[in-house]
Design a protein with these regions (language model features):
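Acidic, low-complexity intrinsically disordered regions
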Residues: 1-306
Length: 306
C-alpha cells in the first residue's frame, strides 16, 4: 500500500465534509473493531516503493485510545495528520512518508487492544483512521499494552525501506500511562494471532522492533493518568527508552513534536529544529527534545517468533 501523495487541498475537502464542526463521536462512528483493522486477522502490512513514492519511509503513530486518550486520535483527525504530512514534505527529514495509525488499549481487559490501518501516503490514512473504534475503556490497572504495537511492527510489517534500502522506519507510541511489561503467550495469540512459545518481556519485544524501526514514546505529561503522576509513567518507560522517551507538555504540539524528533534523529540540531517553529510551539518542542541525541540506523529484516 502507499500509492498517491498527500495533498493539502484533499485534506481541506475531506476535513470540511467529515471533521469540521463534528464532535468526537460524530467523527469516530465505529462501535466495534472492524475486521480489516484487527491485527489477529492481518497476515502482513506492506510499505512499498512506487512511482509516486520511490523511497517510501514507513511511519507508525500508535495512539492510546483508552479513557480520555481518544483526544489524541481526535487531534490527529482535526489537524495533526495534515501538519505531520505537509511538514515532512516541506522539511524533508525523510523521504516519501507512508503513514499508519494504530489504536492501542489494554490486552488484559479490552476487546480491541490494538487496531491497525494500512500504510498510506494520501488522504486514505485519514479515512481509515476515522474508522478505528475508540473503545475508551482501559483496565484501570496502571498500564496499557503499548508493546502490542511494537510486536506487530516487528512481526507483521514488510517494507522496502529496510528490505531494499537498509533504512529504518519510525514507530512512535503516544499516551499517558505506564507500559505493561510485555505480553503473555495468551495475549499474543488473542491480540496478534501469533503463536509464541513463551511470554515476551517489554525489553524482548523492543529488541525485535528496534531492528527495523527507530522507536520513540511520547508521554503526554499533562493529560490523564500522567497529570500529577508523570514520574510513575517515566519509571516504566525510561529504563526501556532512556533517550527516546519524550515528555510533551502540550498535546496541541503533538504533530510538530513527531516531525521534530524525526528531524533530530536524522541529524538536525535540536535547537535549530525547535527554533524553526513559531510562537509557543517552539518552546514546547524545545522542552520535548531536551536530551535527545541525533542518531541513525539501518534496517535488518522481518522478525519471526520461535
Amino acid at each position: 500500500m502507499g500509492n498517491g501523495r498527500w495533498s493539502a487541498q484533499d485534506w481541506q475537502t475531506y476535513s470540511s465534509a467529515s471533521v469540521a464542526g463534528k464532535s468526537q463521536q460524530q467523527i469516530f462512528t465505529s462501535r466495534h473493531m472492524q475486521d480489516q483493522y484487527n491485527p489477529a486477522l492481518i497476515t502482513m502490512r506492506e510499505s512499498r516503493d512506487s512511482a509516486d513514492n520511490p523511497q517510501a519511509t514507513p511511519i507508525i503513530l500508535a495512539s492510546d485510545v483508552t479513557g480520555s486518550m481518544g483526544l489524541i486520535a481526535e487531534k490527529l483527525m482535526r489537524e495533526g495528520l495534515n501538519t505531520l504530512a505537509t511538514e515532512i514534505y516541506d522539511r524533508k527529514p525523510v523521504s516519501d512518508p507512508h503513514i499508519m495509525i494504530m489504536g492501542v488499549g489494554d490486552a488484559k481487559t479490552d476487546q480491541a487492544p490494538l487496531q491497525v490501518t494500512q500504510f498510506e501516503a494520501d488522504i486514505r490514512v485519514a479515512e481509515q483512521a476515522r474508522e478505528l473504534w475508540l473503545e475508551g475503556y482501559g483496565g484501570g490497572n496502571g498500564g496499557e499494552s503499548y508493546m502490542a504495537a511494537h510486536l506487530f511492527a516487528a512481526t507483521k510489517v514488510s517494507a522496502d525501506a529496510w528490505e531494499k534500502h537498509g533504512r529504518k522506519g519510525y514507530l512512535v507510541t503516544i499516551g499517558d500511562e505506564p507500559v505493561h511489561d510485555g505480553m503473555t503467550r495468551d495475549e499474543i495469540q488473542r491480540v496478534l494471532g501469533i503463536s509464541a512459545e513463551a511470554d515476551l518481556s517489554a525489553r524482548e519485544i523492543l529488541a525485535m522492533a528496534e531492528r527495523n524501526w527507530e522507536v520513540f514514546h511520547i508521554v503526554l505529561a499533562n493529560e490523564g493518568y500522567a497529570r500529577g503522576r508523570v514520574d510513575r509513567v517515566l519509571d516504566t518507560w525510561k529504563p526501556l527508552l532512556p533517550e527516546r522517551t519524550i515528555q510533551l507538555q502540550d498535546v496541541d504540539a503533538l504533530a510538530e513534536t513527531v516531525v521534530s524528533l524525526i528531524q533530530v534523529n536524522e541529524g538536525a540540531r535540536p535547537a535549530d529544529v525547535a527554533a524553526s517553529w513559531s510562537g509557543s510551539t517552539a518552546m514546547v518542542v524545545a522542552d520535548a527534545l531536551k536530551g535527545m541525541p541525533a542518531r541513525t540506523g539501518r534496517g535488518g529484516g522481518l522478525q519471526r517468533l520461535r
